Amino acid sequence: MKYFVVALALVAAFACIAESKPAESEHELAEVEEENELADLEDAVWLEHLADLSDLEEARGFFGNTWKKIKGKADKIMLKKAVKIMVKKEGISKEEAQAKVDAMSKKQIRLYVLKHYGKKALQKVSEKL
């Protein structure tokens, strides 16, 4: 259970990285520099800071691809978990549960599984108290 929670936290972190706003490209920075005809030292420092963001864009590309792979695997795992939970919880056949899960969106599946494990974790904590 602990590993599942840690894995979900990592997936959420990668989601934040992958969906963050893309950095400006070096070409766009050159256009800004030409348009503004930099006179102030502050503007030069600002543009230098933005030029460093291109490295972040490359890193985001790597993490974006990694995130897509992790997200795809996580979606498949969550789909299987949702079917198992429905079969166990509602006492229906696997085919019926699969049909219900197929009708749900990916977001609904994630929420369903997380809600189930959240309740389960809360019950375990309350039993220990």
Swiss-Prot record:
Subcellular location, record wording: Secreted
Broad class of the protein's primary localization: secreted
Entry keyword annotation includes Transferase: no
Propeptide stretches in the record: 21-60
Tissue: Expressed by the venom gland.
GO biological process: defense response to bacterium; killing of cells of another organism
Signal sequence residues: 1-20
Keywords: Antibiotic, Antimicrobial, Cytolysis, Hemolysis, Secreted, Signal, Toxin
GO molecular function: toxin activity
GO CC terms: extracellular region
Pfam families membership: Latarcin (PF10279)
Presence of keyword Nucleotide-binding: no
Family recorded in the similarity comment: Belongs to the cationic peptide 06 (cytoinsectotoxin) family.
Main function: Insecticidal, cytolytic and antimicrobial peptide. Forms voltage-dependent, ion-permeable channels in membranes. At high concentration causes cell membrane lysis.
UniProt name for this protein: M-zodatoxin-Lt8k
Protein source organism: Lachesana tarabaevi (Spider)
